């Protein structure tokens, strides 16, 4: 996930997608750029991830509930970031209304956008890879798809796309990438 791509971050349960989005947001806030967070935000997680920022940096963070009116006033400029945490329901398929709402948001945004959703898992307990809700449609809207999951047998997270894979470990200052042995 480089610093300019707009991304659909598909995550498994307990994979810390919100923490990773906060870490990305922190980089923007530290640089004096605006971050708009659309959706739920855990106060305790936000405190631990960005609570050390000064008031001026935190003043560039806007948090709105998904579906709120007047969202156009929230949009960051081109050097900012829009995070839409949980763009669709975590159960079943994304509804037509959810896809249309996301499409409207993406059409308004002139900045980098990161949207998250819980990945679909094999209900039968099979070992198939998780799948992304409305993947083709979202990629058609300009979002690259990344998958975030917990590694088997360890505390690491694995971030993968169609052509990349990265292992992450969480430390006191957030996530860092680790090299394969």
Where are the predicted features?
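Phosphate-binding/switch region of NTP-binding enzymes
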Residues: 108-181
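Conserved P-loop
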Residues: 2-72
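Phosphate-binding/switch loop-helix module in NTP-utilizing enzymes
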Residues: 62-115
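Structural alpha-beta junctions
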Residues: 30-34, 55-59, 105-114, 139-142
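Short amphipathic alpha-helical segments and helix-helix/interface helices
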Residues: 22-26, 99-107, 135
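Short, well-ordered secondary-structure micro-motifs
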Residues: 47-49, 74, 93-94, 124-128
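Conserved nucleotide-binding/hydrolysis micro-motifs of P-loop NTPases
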Residues: 41-44, 69, 88-89, 119-123, ...
């Amino acid at each position: 996930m480089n610093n300019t791509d707009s991304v659909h971050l598909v995550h498994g349960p307990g994979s810390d997608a919100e923490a990773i989005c906060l870490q990305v947001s922190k980089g923007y806030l530290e640089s004096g750029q605006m971050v708009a967070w659309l959706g739920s935000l855990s106060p305790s997680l936000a405190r631990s991830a960005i609570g050390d920022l000064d008031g001026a940096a935190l003043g560039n963070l806007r948090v709105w509930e998904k579906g709120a009116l007047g969202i156009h006033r929230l949009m960051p400029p081109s050097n900012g970031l829009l995070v839409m945490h949980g763009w669709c329901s975590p159960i079943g398929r994304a509804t037509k209304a959810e896809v249309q709402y996301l499409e409207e948001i993406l059409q308004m945004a002139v900045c980098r956008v990161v949207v998250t959703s819980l990945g679909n898992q094999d209900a039968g307990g099979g070992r198939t890879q998780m799948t992304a809700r409305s993947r083709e449609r979202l990629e058609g809207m300009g979002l690259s798809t990344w998958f975030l999951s917990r590694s088997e047998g360890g505390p690491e997270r694995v971030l993968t796309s169609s052509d990349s894979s990265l292992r992450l470990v969480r430390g006191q200052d957030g996530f860092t990438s680790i090299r394969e042995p």
